[in-house]
Amino acid sequence: MKSVITALPKGRLMGEVIDILKQSGFISNNIDINTLSRQLVFHDKKTRNSFLLAKPKDVPVYVEHGAADLGITGKDVLLEHGRNLYEMVDLGVGKCKLVVAVPESKGYKSLADIPEYSRVATSYPEIVKKFFQGKGIQVEVIKLNGSVELAPLVDLADVIVDISSTGTTLKKNNLIPMETIVTSSARLVVNNVSYKIKHKQISELINKINEVVKSGNTEISRK
């Protein structure tokens, strides 16, 4: 029986994701997260499952191209990159919001106050383009790979769209959240071909993870 290969997200999601996988028997309880986080590829001899560790934005790429059978990443990542994958489970962890935020000094009260052709800094250009097009607002989207909240401070952008969990970072930088574009949480996705070839194995694993999520041991976030 071939092992199931899962792409796991490095960073803030990893700890909560590993907890769920341990509870579901997907990964051994004796596996140390600190040891695991330093590896790129890991095989769990007890469960016979294999894991790849990748940046959250790269997880869908590994799954779509068949390097991994399963993957776990945020809904925000899936929406931005639009990969052809089956989304199987909302793990209910890693909850955050993708929000439109503006400097307090601008005095904007709503999206309607944002001038045409304002510059919007974000790590999610595709989501942002669709959002503002849907609102009928013409903007210039500037893609950044991190520290998006810096953009208004140096006059690179008038508006930002960024992930916010608690709102603390926005507040520290005098940014006011104006509107939520999407609420995100960690999702389990599967490669379309793998789901057919390894259907029994993958279905059993998904069912176990679903049981843990529905048991209340992890907080459930609705789609």
From Swiss-Prot:
One of its GO terms (cellular component) is cytoplasm. It is found in: Cytoplasm. Keywords: Amino-acid biosynthesis, ATP-binding, Cytoplasm, Glycosyltransferase, Histidine biosynthesis, Nucleotide-binding, Transferase. Pfam families: HisG. Pathway: Amino-acid biosynthesis; L-histidine biosynthesis; L-histidine from 5-phospho-alpha-D-ribose 1-diphosphate: step 1/9. CDD domains: PBP2_HisGs (cd13595). Its EC number is 2.4.2.17. Gene3D superfamilies: Periplasmic binding protein-like II. GO terms for molecular function: ATP binding; ATP phosphoribosyltransferase activity. The keyword NAD does not apply. SUPFAM superfamilies: Periplasmic binding protein-like II. GO terms for biological process: L-histidine biosynthetic process. It catalyses: 1-(5-phospho-beta-D-ribosyl)-ATP + diphosphate = 5-phospho-alpha-D-ribose 1-diphosphate + ATP. Heteromultimer composed of HisG and HisZ subunits. Catalyzes the condensation of ATP and 5-phosphoribose 1-diphosphate to form N'-(5'-phosphoribosyl)-ATP (PR-ATP). Has a crucial role in the pathway because the rate of histidine biosynthesis seems to be controlled primarily by regulation of HisG enzymatic activity. Belongs to the ATP phosphoribosyltransferase family. Short subfamily. Lacks the C-terminal regulatory region which is replaced by HisZ. This is ATP phosphoribosyltransferase. The gene is hisG.
